[in-house]
Every structure is written in C-alpha cells, then in structure tokens.
Amino acid sequence: MHRLQVVLGHLAGRPESSSALQAAPCSARFPQASASDVVVVHGRRTPIGRASRGGFKNTTPDELLSAVLTAVLQDVRLKPEQLGDISVGNVLEPGAGAVMARIAQFLSGIPETVPLSTVNRQCSSGLQAVANIAGGIRNGSYDIGMACGVESMSLSGMGNPGNISSRLLESEKARDCLTPMGMTSENVAERFGISRQKQDDFALASQQKAASAQSRGCFRAEIVPVTTTVLDDKGDKKTITVSQDEGVRPSTTMQGLAKLKPAFKDGGSTTAGNSSQVSDGAAAVLLARRSKAEELGLPILGVLRSYAVVGVPPDVMGIGPAYAIPAALQKAGLTVNDIDIFEINEAFASQAVYCVEKLGIPAEKVNPLGGAIALGHPLGCTGARQVVTLLNELKRRGRRAYGVVSMCIGTGMGAAAVFEYPGN
C-alpha cells in the first residue's frame, strides 16, 4: 500500500520522502558464507545478433539455447544428469517456448530425466528464470539447476496480445496494458520531464561504453561463439561464426542521434537511436546450493542475495526499476551506495534516465559496459544476459562487491535482483 501511494503521489507530481528511494550513507555489510546460500556457479551467453539483419536472422531459438546450455556444462565439467531442473525465459515463442526449450535440452545432450519449464514475465523472463531456479534450491526441491533466457526476434512475430475480452474497455488500467511500448516511453518522457537531449546523451554513452568494452575484449569470457547458417540476399546458404555483439556502433555521435526522427509520435522524443535494439540471443546461468557447489568442486561466481518484483502503472511501465531496485535493496539490507554496478536494462533511454535520476545512482555505476541501446534486447534473454555480464565485470574488478540487475516489464512491472561477488 505504501509503495502504491508513493507511485501515485509521484505520478501526480507531489514530492515524496520515501527513504527507500534515497541514497543512504555507505553501509556495505558482507554476510558470512552459509551452506544454504544460492550461488551462481557459471554463466555464458551468445553474441547478440541484429534481428532480421544479423548473423542469427535464420537461426532458430532452440539452436541458440543449445549453444549456451552446452557451453556452461562443458566449462564446469558438470554431468548433465546432475541438474535438478531447468527454467527458460522466453516471450515470443508459442507457450513461452515450452516445446522449443525441451528440444534444445535434448540437442544439448541433457537426458529426459531432467525436468524443464519455461516462463514468460516479458522483459524480465530471463531474470525470473534465475529466481525460479533459486526458489527450487531454497525450498529443497533440488540442489543445482540451470536458468536460461532465449529469444529470436527475427523469427517470431510481435504485437499480437492474444484473445482479449471486450470488457477491457471497462477498465482504464486494462486498456493501458495494450499501450505500445514506444508510447509508454513517450509517456515517461512527458510526465517526468526527460528531455530529448538527456535521452540522446544517455544513448551516446551506452554506445561509447559498449564500443570500448568490445574493443578491450571485456565480453570475451562470457560470449559463446556460434557457428550457424545464414541466407544471403540471393537465398544462398552461407556458414558463418558469430563471435561478437552486432549492435554496437562505435561511430555514433550526438549529431547523428539528433538527426533521427521520433519513432512513435509526431513531436515525440523517442527515436531508433535512444531505444533498445530488436535482437536475437540466448544466455544460461548455472545455480546451486553452496554446499552442493563445494561438494562438486564447482567455482562460485556470485551469490544471489535478494529478488523483488513490483507493479507500476502500465502506461508508464518503464519506471519499474525505480521501485523494484529499492525493494530488492531493502530485502538485502543494502542501500544504493553499497552497490558497485547497476545493470539496468535500457528498454528506452527515457525510462532508464528517469530511474537513474530517481534513485540518485552515480552515472559511472550504471551499465559500465553499455546496455540494450548498444548491445540489443532479445526479450526473454536479457535478464539472464545481464546476470552473466554483471558477475563477469565484478570478477574482472577483483574485489568483493555487490551488483544489481533490473529491468522494466511491459504491462506495468519492474524486477530487480542483488548479487554479491565474493572476491578473487
């Protein structure tokens, strides 16, 4: 109820004093390791391909998913039959990709005795898969499991909400669930005063950070090169290997961004340059109970400290992280100042800027390797991809630290998770 009052008060333009949204003095506390901790053992991802134009435009999602499932198991030398469960986030495939994901499991050599489910919480599906596997570990259903996300936006259609009752006309919030995502971005920009200049500044920074990270090889440890077949303009098959993200544009300039026309509304501020890219990709994260990881001699890349999902108004769904992040931090007993890296999905620059400003997050802590504006946003994959990128970057830095993964969710939600990197 308090959160609802805070959200409604902010939407009405009233000042609020919720301490959960304020950056408090640094109070980082690293808890003692517990045998029951849910730990991240390892994670890999495919490169992110440009939908309909990139190297994965003809690659089916089961092949993308199989690539990361196989790589994670091989990297840590885990026997596939030791998995207790697999959860796969997917948005666009029929039935959240339930059949596709089970096929990918078998293509990866994982036996039928290992169960699998899929989940669709839209843009947070990959992170929800992580939470689902963590929940199974915590409740004792199993000790080790795989959380994944996958999306082929090249091969799957968007925009059909399915069979909807005509009674949605009776509810404003129900109608708002059908607001096009681009229009929710325009709503955020207008309602909260996020200028075109701020959006383009944020987009340029994302491209520059991603280009720098790519040139320095920062993604090399997390990316699984994928050899696949692509059809050229003449319809001829060609075998290629995709080994790096395709959406990064090192030549991006403010002048170039400023020339782009509004994509969703005349006189609007959301453009193709300050929005996330339509993309293809997959990611997989291996989780375990700490005691099981130690028993099997598996590495520990991180510890899941908290997870939260919140609801916000559907027509400004992009503000979700501004409310999910404080909820996750509170569960972990932490503040904004305790976090070294915030991986906040850049669905649109408008909503990302709003969330960063609302929470008072220093710019240098936000998406240090770039985000979805530069890297791309394969819907079901993104949450799992962010976990892999976050923990690998914390590992590169070497010291014990906390990081946050968060994203907005279509129809009006936000999700966030807090991870601890244990230090080299």
UniProtKB/Swiss-Prot annotation:
GO terms for cellular component: mitochondrion; peroxisomal matrix; peroxisome. This is 3-ketoacyl-CoA thiolase A, peroxisomal. Residues 1-26 form a transit peptide. The active site is at C123, H377, C408. Belongs to the thiolase-like superfamily. Thiolase family. Its main location: other. Pathway: Lipid metabolism; peroxisomal fatty acid beta-oxidation. One of its GO terms (molecular function) is acetyl-CoA C-acyltransferase activity. The modification N6-acetyllysine is found at K173, K234. Homodimer. Interacts (via PTS2-type peroxisomal targeting signal region) with PEX7; leading to its translocation into peroxisomes. The PTS2-type peroxisomal targeting signal, which mediates interaction with PEX7 and localization to peroxisomes, is cleaved following import into peroxisomes. Gene3D superfamilies: 3.40.47.10. It is found in: Peroxisome. Its EC number is 2.3.1.16, 2.3.1.155, 2.3.1.9. InterPro entries: Thiolase, Thiolase-like, Thiolase-like_sf_Thiolase, Thiolase_acyl_enz_int_AS, Thiolase_AS, Thiolase_C, Thiolase_CS, Thiolase_N. It catalyses: an acyl-CoA + acetyl-CoA = a 3-oxoacyl-CoA + CoA; 2 acetyl-CoA = acetoacetyl-CoA + CoA; tetradecanoyl-CoA + acetyl-CoA = 3-oxohexadecanoyl-CoA + CoA; hexanoyl-CoA + acetyl-CoA = 3-oxooctanoyl-CoA + CoA. One of its GO terms (biological process) is bile acid metabolic process. It holds the Pfam family Thiolase_C. The keyword Acetylation applies. Mainly expressed in liver and intestine. Residues 1-26 are annotated as: PTS2-type peroxisomal targeting signal. It comes from Mus musculus. Responsible for the thiolytic cleavage of straight chain 3-keto fatty acyl-CoAs (3-oxoacyl-CoAs). Plays an important role in fatty acid peroxisomal beta-oxidation. Catalyzes the cleavage of short, medium, long, and very long straight chain 3-oxoacyl-CoAs. Keywords: Acetylation, Acyltransferase, Fatty acid metabolism, Lipid metabolism, Peroxisome, Transferase, Transit peptide.
